[in-house]
């Protein structure tokens, strides 16, 4: 499970997820990647499920890079609890994803295999995504 080893503060405000991504919008390592088309939140279980789906299809022949890390704590009150009484403990760790952010990168296999592996992992993510290549990465979201 992905989570930070240590944080300065244990809890964080919810915040807003507006605008487009500024960082992480180009392929750095791989030849193919998954780019977010809409905003959302991704947790460590979803990242791991997408990674497993991808690596199983390519039989561990390809090199996979994960470009996101869940570093924001998400708290949740138990069911049938009255309001007040403070903020509860951390339920899970998430990362806000903005449109245009590259989530996974892949290299080491041909294009057909890479596209199929990325499609399988796209189904595990909770927001719309698209496949980008080195040639198509400059397209608008």
Swiss-Prot record:
InterPro entries linked to this entry: Ribosomal_uL16 (IPR047873), Ribosomal_uL16_bact-type (IPR000114), Ribosomal_uL16_dom (IPR016180), Ribosomal_uL16_sf (IPR036920)
One biological process term in Gene Ontology: translation
Record Gene3D superfamilies: Ribosomal protein L10e/L16
Keywords of this entry: Ribonucleoprotein, Ribosomal protein, RNA-binding, rRNA-binding, tRNA-binding
The keyword Ribosomal protein belongs to this UniProt entry's keyword annotation: yes
Pfam families referenced in this protein's UniProt entry, alphabetically: Ribosomal_L16
GO terms for cellular component: cytosolic large ribosomal subunit
Superkingdom of the organism of origin: Bacteria
GO molecular function, one term: tRNA binding
Family: Belongs to the universal ribosomal protein uL16 family.
Assembly behavior: Part of the 50S ribosomal subunit.
Function of the protein: Binds 23S rRNA and is also seen to make contacts with the A and possibly P site tRNAs.
PANTHER family named in the record: 50S/60S RIBOSOMAL PROTEIN L16 (PTHR12220), LARGE RIBOSOMAL SUBUNIT PROTEIN UL16M (PTHR12220:SF13)
Alphabetized NCBIfam families for the sequence: rplP_bact (TIGR01164)
HAMAP family per record: Ribosomal_uL16
Protein name according to UniProt: Large ribosomal subunit protein uL16
């Amino acid at each position: 499970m992905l989570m930070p080893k240590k944080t300065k503060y244990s809890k964080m405000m919810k915040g807003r997820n507006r605008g487009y991504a500024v960082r992480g919008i180009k392929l750095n390592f791989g030849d193919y990647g998954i780019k977010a088309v809409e905003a959302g939140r991704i947790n460590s279980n979803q990242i791991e499920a997408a990674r497993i789906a991808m690596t199983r299809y390519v039989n561990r022949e390809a090199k996979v890079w994960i470009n996101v890390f869940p570093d924001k704590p998400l708290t949740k009150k138990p069911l049938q609890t009255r309001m007040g009484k403070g903020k509860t403990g951390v339920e899970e760790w998430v990362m806000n994803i903005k449109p245009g952010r590259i989530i996974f990168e892949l290299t080491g296999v041909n294009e057909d295999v890479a596209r199929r592996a990325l499609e399988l992992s796209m189904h595990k993510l909770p927001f719309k995504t698209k496949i980008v290549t080195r040639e198509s990465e400059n397209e608008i979201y």
